[in-house]
Amino acid sequence: MDDTKKRIHKYIEKHDLIRSDDKLLVAVSGGPDSFALLHFLWSANLVPKEAIAVAHLNHHLRENAEKEQLAVQTFCEERDIPFFIEEVDVKKRAEKLQKGIEETARIVRYDFFEKVMAENNINKLVLAHHADDQIETILMRLVRGSSSIGWSGIQPKREVRGGYAIRPFLPITKAEIIEYATKHALPYEIDESNTSQEYTRNRYRTQLLPFLSKENPAVYEHFKRFSEETSEDFQFLEELASNLLKKNLIQNGKQSTLLLSDFKNEANPLQRRAIHLLLMYLYNDDGRVITVNHIYQIIQMIQSENPSSSIDLPKKLTVIRSYNELHFQFGERHAPPEFYHQLELNDRIELDNKASIRLKLKSSVVQTNGLNGMLLDAEDITLPLIVRNRVNGDRMTMKGQAGSKKLKDIFIDAKIPRQERDNLPVITDYTGKILWVPGVKKSAYDREFSRSKKQYIIRYTRNIGGNESMHNDIQKVLISEDELQEKIRELGRELTAEYEGRNPLVVGVLKGATPFMTDLLKRIDTYLEMDFMDVSSYGNGTVSSGEVKIIKDLNASVEGRDVLIIEDIIDSGRTLSYLVDLIKYRKAKSVKLVTLLDKPAGRNVAIEADYVGFVVPNEFVVGYGLDYAERYRNLPYIGILKPEIYSE
């Protein structure tokens, strides 16, 4: 075996590119690189010959395209190699897609390859990129200003639909490939466009590469090592960045929101890598769209003292900084819709944000529900009321303050995101006096209840969630889905060891523990029985009522049984304390408690779990079974609910 073949075999083994049970689809254009690749694979016995197939796409871009197609077809027919040929007029397709010819050619090429792989149960696409391509790619990316991940160049293996694209020729040069193809008399065609100085890559190939090779003949090996070491570094950093995104990224349809409270405290290299990873996801792994400048612009937004800013990126991606959130969304920016409603006594109006506003005459002692209800003295205002957008120059008279304050400054003080301010309802009386911005601020016209005065009450009701995503109501992802499952696997192992051979009765506490219990039981590898109780002291609020009620009792007897209680969270502890005492009273042999979450700061009674998943801070947490007003149970993670949601 000559040195060239040895290096190829060593490279394949090092990067685990080809296994004996793989099925290979070799992309053959008709040039020396791909013909040499096909011949090498055909003769190397890495896989059975019947596991090799060929794909050729005729782009109809070159004069010798028909000769190339015929050469590929003839070569395959002579050796009984299955081949797939497709013809596409790339110029017409590019006009239709409104993309460049090179980008369009790449799209149709990979669509064709992946289609053939899927239809023929092929798991590896083999491409003929070589060491010259590697150097050209790295240099082009550095000069163009690509993000640092691009510095590692062409990777030996990457995922495609249905399998992997592999590049076993990366360790050898173009000259070695030509020598191989000539030695074996392969019928390749030379692409006449390869000498045109019109293309950037050709200028690098004909001008820079000869210079570098002359300066140091070992340049190919040096760039290969640079690529591999850089790739290893970035893979390590990417794993850290991926975990960082899992904790701080909320995805909602067309919008992705990065929570900045913790993210902005991470080291700059990790922030940059996470932003690059997110952009790669948003751009469907098309790294050519992303430059270093894009990433640095976003990092500057994150680190800026300005809480509200935005930038526009390629392909209509807008990045919006809104205090401690960074929103990524595709599409044109639209001006917010203007609205103007008159609100008569006993009327109710529905707003586009799925909220409603009602005006009634006060009839009894009224509590105005925080920021979402308001009492007005009839003598202070003129009906009908007006509900509208804000306008330039809006000012509100404030309680306990002389003069008035700009609405813009009120929004800034309340940290209302800039993109949301134009959508907030502003309530005035008929003369134009601003009375209230629901959920934000009340004016000096807000009154206490009076039996002697005629008063009106305005109610602002928000339909929590509405058509919007529930993810938008989350202030911070506290525990990611992956972290939950990792902890559940750990608890499952501990409980398997604890209860092996004891056939415990596992009691799930409805409703919150259901997702946790479902996943946990899959990880307990021993015989058990399960039952459920619904014992509550909450209701629809955020604070325990203190009264414990049995809504659903057990069907099974606990007498003489080892009982394991599964709960979603221990907060005040009243419910669980009552339940443990009850089961002990019913003569259970043993009672142990496993809880996903423990909130020690909320404890009112002395109770501790035997097994704890996570200790959480004294915040209102929802998701993965935990709710507020019966919502958010189906979130796949544990998140902290925004205070404005449960203070409404």
From Swiss-Prot:
InterPro entries: Hxn_phspho_trans (IPR005904), Lysidine-tRNA-synth_C (IPR012796), PRibTrfase_dom (IPR000836), PRTase-like (IPR029057), Rossmann-like_a/b/a_fold (IPR014729), TilS/TtcA_N (IPR011063), tRNA_Ile_lys_synt (IPR012094), tRNA_Ile_lys_synt_N (IPR012795)
GO terms for biological process, alphabetical: purine ribonucleoside salvage; tRNA modification
Main location: cytoplasm
CDD domains in the record: PRTases_typeI, TilS_N
GO cellular component: cytoplasm
Transmembrane segments: none
Cofactor note: Binds 2 magnesium ions per subunit. One of the ions does not make direct protein contacts.
Sites where the protein binds Mg(2+): 627
Reaction catalysis annotation: IMP + diphosphate = hypoxanthine + 5-phospho-alpha-D-ribose 1-diphosphate; GMP + diphosphate = guanine + 5-phospho-alpha-D-ribose 1-diphosphate; cytidine(34) in tRNA(Ile2) + L-lysine + ATP = lysidine(34) in tRNA(Ile2) + AMP + diphosphate + H(+)
EC number annotated for this UniProt entry: 6.3.4.19, 2.4.2.8
Binding site for ATP: 29-34
Keywords: ATP-binding, Cytoplasm, Glycosyltransferase, Ligase, Magnesium, Metal-binding, Nucleotide-binding, Transferase, tRNA processing
Compartments reported by the entry: Cytoplasm
Domain of life of the native organism: Bacteria
Cofactor(s), by name: Mg(2+)
GO molecular function: ATP binding; guanine phosphoribosyltransferase activity; hypoxanthine phosphoribosyltransferase activity; metal ion binding; tRNA(Ile)-lysidine synthase activity
Listed Pfam families: ATP_bind_3, Pribosyltran, TilS_C
Coiled coil: none
Protein role: Ligates lysine onto the cytidine present at position 34 of the AUA codon-specific tRNA(Ile) that contains the anticodon CAU, in an ATP-dependent manner. Cytidine is converted to lysidine, thus changing the amino acid specificity of the tRNA from methionine to isoleucine.
Family: In the N-terminal section; belongs to the tRNA(Ile)-lysidine synthase family.
Domain comment quoted from the record: The N-terminal region contains the highly conserved SGGXDS motif, predicted to be a P-loop motif involved in ATP binding.
PANTHER family noted in UniProt: TRNA(ILE)-LYSIDINE SYNTHASE-RELATED
Protein name in UniProt: Bifunctional protein TilS/HprT
